[in-house]
Structures are given as C-alpha cells and as structure tokens.
Amino acid sequence: MEKLQAQYCYLCSENIRKTNPFILNILQKLDEEIEKRPKEKFTVNIAGNNRLDSGQRITGEDFWLLSKTLRNQPCISGVDVRYNLIGDVGAFYAAKLLQKQPSITYLNLMFNDIGPEGGELIAKALHKNKTLKYLRMTGNKIENTGGMLFAAMLQMNSSLEKLDLGDCDLGLQCVIAFSTVLTQNQAIKGINLNRPILYGEQEESTVHIGHMLKENHVLVELHMCKHGMKNYGLQQLCNALYLNSSLRYLDVSCNKITRDGMVFLADVLKSNTTLEVLDLSFNRIETAGAKYLSETLTSHNRSLKALSVVSNKIEGEGLVALSQSMKTNLVLSNIYIWGNKFDEDTCVAYSDLIKSGRLKPDNTDVEPYMVDEHIYLSEVSNGLKRHYYWAPTYGETYMPSSSAGFALVPVGEHL
C-alpha cells in the first residue's frame, strides 16, 4: 500500500497545487504509526487549533486533495478536521468521501464554516452510507434548512449512532423534527442539540423531547444545553424519565432551572434506575435544590454515578448535604461543585471525603489546601466534558478525569 504522504504529494503535483506543510507533517507521522502497527485502525487528526503544529488551517481545496489521498485506505477509520476552514466546498468532498470510503466510522467537521448548503450535501450522503457511526457538525451554521435535512436523513439511515448538532443555529422546527424522528429511529444512541435558536417562553422544545423520551428506548445520551429550559420544561423531561429505561446521560446545563425544578428531579430519581450522569451546571438550584437532591441520593437512588452542580448559587449548607449523601451512597463516585459559595464547613467536608478515599481526586473539580490551619478548596481541571470543545495538544489526548461523562457512559470511541 502506497504511503499517505507520497500519495498526497503525487496528487498535489498532478493537480498543480501547492502541498500544505501542515497536512504533510500529519501524514508523515501517520505513515510511521501505520508502519509500526499495520493491523490497527487510525484517525487522521488535522485539528486547526493545534498550536504545536505550525502551518495554516486547511481550506476546502486542501480537503479535496486530502480526501482523494484517503480513498482506498482501509486502515483509516476516522477523519478529524476540527477548527479549519473547509466550508461548503470541503463539505462537498466530505460527502464524496462518505460515499466512496466505507472504512470511515468517525467524521469530525466541527467549526469549519459549513453552511446550510454544505449541511445538505453531508445529510444526503448519509442516506445511503451504512458505516459511519459518529458525526460531529458542532458550530457549523447549517441553520433550520440543514437541520431539517439531517432529521429527514435519520428516517433513512440505520447505522449512525451518535450525532452532534450543537451550536448549529437549529430552529424550533428542527428540534420538533428530531423529536418526531427519534420516536422511530432505533440506531441513534447519543444526540447533541445544544443551543438552538428559540423564540418565546413556552418551552416547546422540552415538551416535544419529553414525548420522544417516553417512546424511545434506545437513546443513551442527550445534551440540551442552552434551551432556555425552566422548571416546567424540566418537569416534562422528568415525567418522561418515569417511563424511559435507556437514558444514562442527561445534560441540561446552562438553562434557567431553579430550586422548584429539583423537586421534580429528586422525585423521579427515587424510582429511575437508569440515569448515571446528570449535568446541572450553570443553572440556579441554590441550597434548597441541592438539599432536595441530597435527600434522594442519601435514601433512595443507587444508580447515579456522576453529578455536576457547578455554578448553581449553592451555599455551604447545600454543599455539605451533598457531601454527606456520598457517605451513605457508595455508587455516586463523581461530584463537581466549583463556582458555588464555599464556607469552612464545605471545605472541611470535601477535604475529609478526599482524604478518606471516598472521593478520588480525579473524580471532582476541587482540591483541598491549608493556609494558617484553615482548609480551602482550589479548582482542578476535571469535569464531565472539559474537552468537548478542545483537546490537549500534548500528553494524553483523552483523559477520563477531564471527560468523566463520556468515560462513564461511552457512546462511540471519540468525544
């Protein structure tokens, strides 16, 4: 099999195009890895936000030549070109690649300036594709037009398992369409519908997703950040969770949920035995909401493994109550509390949990330290999805402590 770097150089000279040094460097490293481990599958990782690799971000024309290089390469199972400038031109060649390269199971096109037209091309390519498992379109403004075509695609495609359309400027019509399609689709295990463009205060998106969760028993992971969700919307989801037996990871961070919403959530957690990861970060559940949760976690729930209440206006009493629940509930292993109001009792409580070994340092976002015989807590770079938007450019690319949600509920191989 011809080396990737040599094939790329040949295609550039044949089409009278300059080689991109960034792509050359990545393909050279990949060739070396393939030579060492010829039977393994590899992902081509050409992230445009990698500061250690000098070179310009790749364009649609660059991606055209790269996609031709990758054809008929059975050892390539993934393509990650996040944070580049491939645009709708690159989306055209990405669609061609999906049609002609059956070994690809993972495609990451996040933040690539792809619009509705590019979204349409990729969605249509997936009508007949039977191998792609995970697609990330995060941050590409495909809008309502592109989003509706992806929803239509899910009626035809029975192999895609995880789809990320976060920050894609989807409209309410799209959210309703996905909710409708997912009542029938038996393949999708994870979906991200973060930050749709919604108008009005009626919380229609959560009502429709709630109806879908009552019918769908395949979906494992659901992200609904920035839906403008209030307590009524959370109540709709909680009503669905009484009937749902598959959802293990629920992300409702960055919404408008308050203490009253925790009454519904605490109640459903008494009987729901499926949910394992719950992200409530950047809401406003306050001390009362934390206490509702801690009561359920102490006396009833024995299935939740990870809870994030980062930046929720919780004071010491609520944080201590959550720490106390961990002493009796031995299933809850991960808790994230940074951004709340720590008092000395809070610092002592979490310091004791860590020192006793009940709470592992990798499973929380705080670390105790002492000054003048007083204990304080500092922030640690751990969380449920710290590497959702970016990945480190050195050391381990995947750290379970920084992406605990995906480590506890793995849907697909990649973030």
UniProtKB/Swiss-Prot annotation:
One GO cellular component term of this record is:
nucleolus
Subcellular location(s) of the protein: Nucleus; Nucleus, Nucleolus; Cytoplasm
Print the keywords alphabetically: Cytoplasm, Differentiation, Leucine-rich repeat, Nucleus, Repeat
What is the predominant subcellular site recorded for this chain? nucleus
The name under which this protein is listed is Leucine-rich repeat-containing protein 34
Subunit record text = Interacts with NPM1 and NCL.
Q: What does this protein do?
A: Highly expressed in stem cells where it may be involved in regulation of pluripotency. In embryonic stem cells (ESCs), important for normal expression of the pluripotency regulators POU5F1/OCT4 and KLF4. Also important for expression of the ectodermal marker gene NES and the endodermal marker gene GATA4. Promotes stem cell proliferation in vitro.
**InterPro entries in the record, alphabetically?**
Leu-rich_rpt, LRR-containing_regulator, LRR_dom_sf
GO terms in the biological process aspect are:
cell differentiation; gene expression; telomere maintenance
The record's account of tissue expression is:
Expressed in testis where it specifically localizes to germ cells (at protein level). Not detected in other tissues tested (at protein level). Expressed in pluripotent embryonic stem cells and multipotent adult germline stem cells.
What are the start and end residues of each LRR repeat? 246-272, 274-296
What is the scientific name of the source organism? Mus musculus (Mouse)
Q: Does the keyword Secreted apply?
A: no
Q: What PANTHER family does this protein's entry cite?
A: LEUCINE-RICH REPEAT-CONTAINING PROTEIN 34
Pfam families xrefs? LRR_6
Organism taxonomic ancestry: Eukaryota, Metazoa, Chordata, Craniata, Vertebrata
